[in-house]
Amino acid sequence: TRKQPNCNVYRSHLFFCTRQMDPICGTNGKSYANPCIFCSEKGLRNQKFDFGHWGHCREYTSARS
């Protein structure tokens, strides 16, 4: 299994990310296109979320109406 991304690698160029697709799901339930974008959102915006797993987040819909 892959380790979570090392956000220190992206510190010098936050928000100057490529369009490479390597999706990450954050613990906030939001999908990020790649580790650079994930780290940028987490670092610069001081958000309270962490790495969830590699791949897109699954959207859960409630069966209740």
UniProtKB/Swiss-Prot annotation:
- Give the disulfide map: C7-C39, C17-C36, C25-C57
Q: Where is this site: Reactive bond?
A: R19, Q20
Where, by tissue, is this protein expressed?
Answer: Seminal plasma.
Keywords of this entry: Disulfide bond, Glycoprotein, Protease inhibitor, Secreted, Serine protease inhibitor
Q: Which InterPro entries match?
A: Kazal_dom (IPR002350), Kazal_dom_sf (IPR036058)
- List glycan-bearing residues: S12, S62
For this record, an example GO cellular component is: extracellular region
Keyword Disulfide bond appears in the UniProt entry:
yes
Q: How is the protein altered post-translationally, as described in the entry? A: The identity of the O-linked saccharides are not reported in Ref.1. The O-linked polysaccharides on Ser-12 and Ser-62 are probably the mucin type linked to GalNAc.
Keyword match Glycoprotein: yes
Q: Where is the Kazal-like domain?
A: 1-59
List the molecular function annotations (GO) for this entry.
Answer: serine-type endopeptidase inhibitor activity
User: What is one Pfam family matched by this protein?
Assistant: Kazal_1
- Task of the protein: Inhibits acrosin.
- The protein depicted here goes by the name Seminal plasma acrosin inhibitor A1
- Give the originating organism: Sus scrofa (Pig)
